[in-house]
Amino acid sequence: MGRDTIADIITSIRNVDMNRKGTVRIESTNMAEKIVKILLREGFIENVRKHQENKKSFLVLTLRHRRNRKGPSP
């Protein structure tokens, strides 16, 4: 059984957004970078930076603040 990278990325972003957090960190892969580039261009993400920790690369995404979103209060 393989991993569904696209679903994992979207789910991570959705979970962080629903919990009203500002940033999410995902593993940096070629596919993840391409997906994030599209989300950035479409306005779902405000900023992206690459972070390296213990020889592993991550993408740190700053989510765009949305009004009237449902989810738990801070």
Curated annotation (Swiss-Prot):
The keyword RNA-binding applies. One of its GO terms (biological process) is translation. Keywords: Chloroplast, Plastid, Ribonucleoprotein, Ribosomal protein, RNA-binding, rRNA-binding. One of its GO terms (cellular component) is ribosome. Pfam families: Ribosomal_S8 (PF00410). Transmembrane segments: none annotated. It is found in: Plastid, Chloroplast. GO terms for molecular function: rRNA binding; structural constituent of ribosome. Its main location: plastid. InterPro entries: Ribosomal_uS8, Ribosomal_uS8_sf. Part of the 30S ribosomal subunit. Belongs to the universal ribosomal protein uS8 family. One of the primary rRNA binding proteins, it binds directly to 16S rRNA central domain where it helps coordinate assembly of the platform of the 30S subunit. This is Small ribosomal subunit protein uS8c. It comes from Oenothera ammophila. The gene is rps8.
